[in-house]
């Protein structure tokens, strides 16, 4: 007959148990998934970087080769990102009214029409319109990707 070794818990005077109560790294790994704040260990050299984090002491080699400044490179990238996004949102014209505030969009439309009326004297270059592409002709009989169709015609 074979005997198995049993583990003792945290307390050496406790009864024998086949259950491991504490993982090798210390602490408990028992988690029910609620009301337990988990603290992530801070790793100095992690792969993923934070966009808005503190500047690293040793920037990656590609940043040096691109000619980025170690002091002002991040600030420029942070400030230009939201500016581009806001300007594209303001000029796109496709706003979605999720809250039902239609009067805000009417004001935007009247302001837009007023500004267009003032700038009619100046020729505005039109954006190139892509030519419509005719869709590919649909074959009259199509087979599914796996082989023959199971369609029965009588």
From Swiss-Prot:
Record PTM N-acetylthreonine, positions in chain: 2
InterPro entries the record matches: JUPITER (IPR033335)
The entry's keywords: Acetylation, Cytoplasm, Nucleus, Phosphoprotein
Modified sites of kind Phosphoserine: 28, 31, 71, 80, 87-88, 92, 131
Composition bias, Basic and acidic residues: 96-108
Main location: nucleus
Compositionally biased region (Polar residues): 1-19, 80-91
Gene Ontology, cellular component aspect: cytosol; intercellular bridge; microtubule cytoskeleton; nucleoplasm; nucleus
Residues with N6-acetyllysine modification: 148
Residue list for modification N-acetylmethionine: 1
Region annotation (Disordered) ranges: 1-154
Compartments where found: Nucleus; Cytoplasm
Bias type Pro residues, positions: 125-138
Modified residues (Phosphothreonine): 54
Keyword Transmembrane helix: no
Subunit structure: Interacts with the complex composed, at least, of APC, CTNNB1 and GSK3B; the interaction takes place with the inactive form of GSK3B (phosphorylated at 'Ser-9').
The family this protein is said to belong to: Belongs to the JUPITER family.
Function: Modulates negatively AKT-mediated GSK3B signaling. Induces CTNNB1 'Ser-33' phosphorylation and degradation through the suppression of the inhibitory 'Ser-9' phosphorylation of GSK3B, which represses the function of the APC:CTNNB1:GSK3B complex and the interaction with CDH1/E-cadherin in adherent junctions. Plays a role in the regulation of cell cycle and cell adhesion. Has an inhibitory role on AR-signaling pathway through the induction of receptor proteasomal degradation.
Protein's recorded name: Jupiter microtubule associated homolog 1
């Amino acid at each position: 007959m074979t005997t198995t070794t049993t583990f003792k818990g945290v307390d050496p005077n406790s009864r024998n148990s086949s259950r491991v109560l504490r993982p090798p790294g210390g602490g408990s790994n028992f988690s029910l998934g609620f009301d337990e704040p988990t603290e992530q260990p801070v790793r100095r050299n992690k792969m993923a970087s934070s966009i808005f984090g503190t500047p690293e002491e040793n920037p990656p080699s590609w940043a040096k080769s691109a000619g980025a400044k170690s002091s002002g490179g991040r600030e420029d990238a942070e400030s230009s990102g939201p500016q581009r996004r806001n300007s594209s949102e303001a000029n796109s014209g496709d706003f979605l009214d999720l809250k039902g505030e239609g009067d805000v969009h009417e004001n935007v439309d009247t302001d837009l029409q007023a500004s267009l009326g003032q700038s009619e004297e100046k020729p505005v270059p039109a954006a190139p319109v892509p030519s419509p592409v005719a869709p590919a002709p649909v074959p009259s009989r199509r087979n599914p990707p796996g082989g023959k169709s199971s369609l029965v015609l009588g």
